[in-house]
Curated annotation (Swiss-Prot):
UniProt organism field: Arabidopsis thaliana (Mouse-ear cress)
Topology feature Vacuolar, residues: 48-50, 113-128, 182-186
Cytoplasmic side: 1-26, 72-91, 150-160, 208-300
Family annotation (Pfam families): Cation_efflux
Family: Belongs to the cation diffusion facilitator (CDF) transporter (TC 2.A.4) family. SLC30A subfamily.
GO cellular component: a single term: membrane
Residues annotated as transmembrane: 27-47, 51-71, 92-112, 129-149, 161-181, 187-207
Protein name per Swiss-Prot or TrEMBL: Metal tolerance protein 12
Molecular function GO terms recorded: metal ion transmembrane transporter activity; zinc ion transmembrane transporter activity
Any one GO biological process: intracellular zinc ion homeostasis
Chief place of localization: membrane
Described purpose of this protein according to its UniProt entry: Involved in sequestration of excess metal in the cytoplasm into vacuoles to maintain metal homeostasis.
Keyword annotations of the record: Ion transport, Membrane, Transmembrane, Transmembrane helix, Transport, Vacuole
Membrane topology: Multi-pass membrane protein
Gene: MTP12
Length: 300
């Protein structure tokens, strides 16, 4: 049975953290609105047999998951390191993002396959409540654009949320247009065509997340710092007393934390302390936040 302390750690503390910050409260409010309307779209989509509306609800599901992960990660990443998690728990966001991205790519692919089947064999769609629900989804996304328009210009995290909502808005526009074409023109093919459009938006929006999170988990040298690191290595080799660089390893622990380990061979008459200081400055200038240096003297 879960203890009260465990319940507080898992749920109450993150909630208090979210409510204590204005930006987090804004994200949480939009998450609640988005989640509620996502359920409405799923129910209406299944009742009306509209694959386009179900696809839009899946896109909203992705955004809800991304918002929830971001909120929880903002709390858990601030927890101090301990004997079990020596680096802290910053990779929670990376791992969750990877799982989320894989799931959405699979969902997008399945929707495309189902859409192709419906293009070949169009099915009747009930438009009685479809237009109202699809317009409502568009209005929810417009509210999101207004919510995050300011953060779009000031913060990378806010910009990411804004772009997710913008893609959602485009998907909602597609659903509204397809609904109008079905209602007034009888073009049943508009629904699966809209679904394919939304699926492409879903996959296109998650591919960068999938690639980035996979590269972090595989400990790839971070793309954003590659040129700076090359320049830093050249400057390290020019440092007085440095003979060579051995066993260089650079990787990202999180999206923003770059880690490096370095084994330097220096001349026997060089000042190791001064060499470490100069090399540390060069690594810091290259964007490395945590590094381990091993300096070994060799005879000239």
């Amino acid at each position: 049975m879960e203890s009260p302390e465990s319940f507080s750690t898992m749920f109450m503390k993150p909630i208090r953290h979210i409510l204590s910050e204005k930006k987090s409260r804004k994200i949480a409010l939009f998450l609640l609105i988005n989640t509620a309307y996502m359920v409405v779209e799923f129910v209406a989509g299944f009742m009306s047999n509209s694959l386009g509306l179900i696809s839009d609800a899946c896109h909203m599901l992705f955004d809800c998951a991304a918002l929830a992960i971001g909120l929880y990660a903002s709390y858990i990443s601030r927890l101090p390191a301990n004997h079990q998690y020596n680096y802290g728990r910053g990779r929670f966001e990376v791992l969750s993002g990877y799982v989320n991205a894989v799931f959405l790519v699979l969902v997008g692919a399945l929707i495309v396959l189902e859409s192709i089947e419906r293009i070949l064999d169009p099915q009747e769609i009930s438009t009685n409540s479809l237009l109202v629900v699809s317009v409502g989804g568009l209005l929810v996304n417009i509210v999101g654009l207004i919510f995050f328009h300011e953060e779009h210009h000031h913060a990378h995290g806010g910009s990411g949320i804004f772009l997710h909502v913008l893609a959602d808005t485009m998907g909602s526009v597609g659903v509204v247009i397809s609904t109008l074409l079905i209602k007034y023109k009888g073009w049943l093919v508009a629904d699966p065509a809209s679904s394919i459009f939304i699926s492409i938006l879903i996959i296109a929006s998650v591919i960068p997340l999938l690639r980035n999170s996979a590269e972090i988990l595989l400990q790839r040298v971070p793309r954003a710092h590659r040129q700076d690191l090359k320049e830093a290595m050249r400057n390290i080799l020019k440092t007085k007393g440095v003979c060579s660089i051995q066993r260089l390893h650079v990787w990202s622990f999180t999206n923003s934390d770059v880690v490096a380990t370095l084994h330097l061979l220096v001349s026997a008459d060089s000042d190791k302390t001064d060499t470490k200081l100069q090399v540390s400055r060069l690594l810091e200038d290259a964007g490395v936040k945590d590094w381990t240096l091993q300096v070994e003297s060799v005879n000239s």
